[in-house]
């Protein structure tokens, strides 16, 4: 079979998940030369205009090496102690290796709850987006020092998929000691076939998943397929590849064996379809004609264009946006609680801090969190009843 070249530079934003066994050796500790080579690959992508995020395993594995903990399963408190020690060493290692190419690393510790609870989700996304805007590479890991369920049952494959959907990435790369998906475990079945392209994750594909690879890694093919379901449903492609080569990303681009999972549409389309599909908006915001014009030209909704706030909703809830005639023209995720939104309605963004007592976000509803549900010039149904508009991204 001819090698399949996969140019990564065609993607806008890539999340790379790195397994523990790639970063940490049980006896010698951190694999510094591998990490340095990986950072060279990341720098090459950034030089081509690609935004890169890293979900890095290895804190517990590195910490247990530093603390000289015995081999085998760790108790919960031992895992948390290992994470506390290992996270410092891991962050320092990433920072030093990336700095060789004048790249600044930013550390973010998450739990799965941070990607599922709306307020924490929005805060985490805003921080990550700001780091990317500033040219930094976010280095993300589970907050294993305080998490309990995540340490015992969690994994960074699924966390990486949630991060990819949260930031609207168009590619997720899972690097470990597994080079892709086979129809059966190849070390058990010599007839196992390698699957290079997976158009859809079917029950048959799910049945091919296996178990964890080693005590240093909590992931296996099962969690990678689960991650694939999360990512591809949100419009993000996924690659499973071996990270064993010293330049794993360059190896993928050169045609090294890997499995590619096709996305379902684009990240923007998937996200906006979800927003438009919310059946019961928590509230509504009425806007003036000028704000409607701005929204239809692709801009965010600013407080100055808001005329009325209706309902009780929290930041991150889905709300309807009504034009001056009372017609729903868009839906989006609220940037403020209802009470705060009422206070700043009609006000300039520069006045927000003085009114609320804190410097909030500039937009009432950011354009990335909004979808137009009615085309320009649409008229209300006779009798005032409205038909829900189609998706207009």
From Swiss-Prot:
GO terms for biological process: L-proline biosynthetic process. This is Glutamate 5-kinase. Keywords: Amino-acid biosynthesis, ATP-binding, Cytoplasm, Kinase, Nucleotide-binding, Proline biosynthesis, Transferase. Residues 374-393 are annotated as: Disordered. ATP binds at residues 17, 176-177. Its EC number is 2.7.2.11. One of its GO terms (molecular function) is glutamate 5-kinase activity. Substrate binds at residues 57, 144, 156. PROSITE patterns: GLUTAMATE_5_KINASE, PUA. Residues 282-359 form the PUA domain. GO terms for cellular component: cytosol. SMART domains: PUA. It is found in: Cytoplasm. Pathway: Amino-acid biosynthesis; L-proline biosynthesis; L-glutamate 5-semialdehyde from L-glutamate: step 1/2. Belongs to the glutamate 5-kinase family. Catalyzes the transfer of a phosphate group to glutamate to form L-glutamate 5-phosphate. Residues 379-393 have a biased composition (Basic and acidic residues). Its main location: cytoplasm. It catalyses: L-glutamate + ATP = L-glutamyl 5-phosphate + ADP.
């Amino acid at each position: 079979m001819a090698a399949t070249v996969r140019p990564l530079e065609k993607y806008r934003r890539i999340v790379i998940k790195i397994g523990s066994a790639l970063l940490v050796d049980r006896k010698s500790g951190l694999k510094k030369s591998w990490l340095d080579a990986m950072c060279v690959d990341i720098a090459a992508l950034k030089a081509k205009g690609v935004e890169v995020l890293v979900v890095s395993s290895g804190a517990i594995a590195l910490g247990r090496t530093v603390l000289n903990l015995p081999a085998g399963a760790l108790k919960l408190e031992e895992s948390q102690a290992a994470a506390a020690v290992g996270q410092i060493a891991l962050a320092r290692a990433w920072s030093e290796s990336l700095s060789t190419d004048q790249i600044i690393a930013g550390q973010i510790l998450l739990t799965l709850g941070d990607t599922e609870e709306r307020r924490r989700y929005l805060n985490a996304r805003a921080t990550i987006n700001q780091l990317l805007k500033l040219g930094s590479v976010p280095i993300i890991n589970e907050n294993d020092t305080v998490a309990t369920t995540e340490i015992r049952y969690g994994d960074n494959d699924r966390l990486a998929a949630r991060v990819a959907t949260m930031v609207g990435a168009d590619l997720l790369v899972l690097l470990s000691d597994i080079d892709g998906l086979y129809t059966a475990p190849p070390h058990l079945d010599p007839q196992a076939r390698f699957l290079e392209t997976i158009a859809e994750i079917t029950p048959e594909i799910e049945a091919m998943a296996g178990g964890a690879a080693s005590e240093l890694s909590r992931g296996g093919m099962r969690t990678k397929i689960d991650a694939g379901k999360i990512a591809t449903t949100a419009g993000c492609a996924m690659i499973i590849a071996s990270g064993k080569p010293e330049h794993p990303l360059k190896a993928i681009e050169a045609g090294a064996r890997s499995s590619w999972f096709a996305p379902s549409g684009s990240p923007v389309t998937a996200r906006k379809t979800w927003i438009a599909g919310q059946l019961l908006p928590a509230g509504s915001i009425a806007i003036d004609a000028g704000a409607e014009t701005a929204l239809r030209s692709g801009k965010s909704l600013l407080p100055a264009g808001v005329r009325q706030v209706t309902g009780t909703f929290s930041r991150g809830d889905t709300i309807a946006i009504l034009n001056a005639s009372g017609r729903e023209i868009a839906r989006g995720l609220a940037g403020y609680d209802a009470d705060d939104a009422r206070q700043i309605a009609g006000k300039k963004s520069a006045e927000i801090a003085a009114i609320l007592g804190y410097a909030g976000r500039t937009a009432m509803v950011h354009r990335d969190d909004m979808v137009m549900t009615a085309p320009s010039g649409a008229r209300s149904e006779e009798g005032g009843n409205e038909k829900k508009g189609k998706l207009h991204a």
